[in-house]
Amino acid sequence: AAFKAYKRGAYIANPCYTQIHPTCIPVSGDYQSKLTLMSESLRNDGRIWVPVSKEDAEAIRTGNKHPEDIAEEDRDYYLERKYPSFGNLAPRDISSRAAKEVCDEGRGVAPTGLGVYLDFKDAIERLGEDVIRSRYSNLFQMYEKISGDNPYKTPMQIFPAVHYTMGGLWVDYNLQTSIPGLHCLGEANFSDHGANRLGASALMQGLADGYFVLPTTIANYLADQKPGSINTDMD
């Protein structure tokens, strides 16, 4: 719909701004051609880590070691180490950049080298498996179907992927595009996020545009429109 509007003359704004999502399933197997999006809610309880040493990471990538073989002191919970105030809930761009950095250092754990662990072991010990299952069972099932690993028993592997473009149809403060009378709200417009969108903003944008802004602005626009003449000739 946005592209159709663009073809009719509507302006596009900020097409270069792209959001990266840090919690995706890395490419694996013969049929998964791209990373698969997971929910950011997983980072509420999962702890993100990679091995401290490149040698341990290489052993995991080649199948000579498993994550359970890495002792606690040989694990780098890098978000907790670098950002103690946020820990594993650091903003998306920071978490994504940090994951790429440790993988670029040679400490990635996926077969491709592009993956880090999201580990629920401590949360399961603290809260119990039933609580974790009640929160994430659908996500865990999806992960297991794709990867073949049981995340209740072994850490998930995750890696950042392109998620969202902040760009969209240009709108003014009344949410009207450059085509008079064509209004655009929610994720289809460009207006709210700048160069980076914070997590959990999609619902907020839809509510703000659709509930608070558009009912007033579109009513004002329609109130200013004068009806044209009506042809009453039925012949």
Write out the residue ranges for each language-model feature.
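An anion/pyrophosphate-binding glycine-rich loop and adjacent beta-alpha core
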Residues: 10-145, 216-219
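General beta-strand structural signal in soluble alpha/beta enzymes
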Residues: 12-17, 154, 171, 184-185
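Acidic, glycine-rich active-site loops and adjacent beta-strand->loop/helix elements
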Residues: 17-26, 188-190, 231-234
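Short, small/polar residue-rich loop motifs at catalytic or cofactor-binding pockets
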Residues: 42, 163-165, 199
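Accessory "access/gating" subregions that flank catalytic or transport cores
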Residues: 127-176
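Short FAD-binding loop at a beta-strand-to-alpha-helix junction that anchors the flavin cofactor
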Residues: 174-198
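Long, amphipathic alpha-helical stalk/connector segments used for oligomerization, subunit docking
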Residues: 220-235
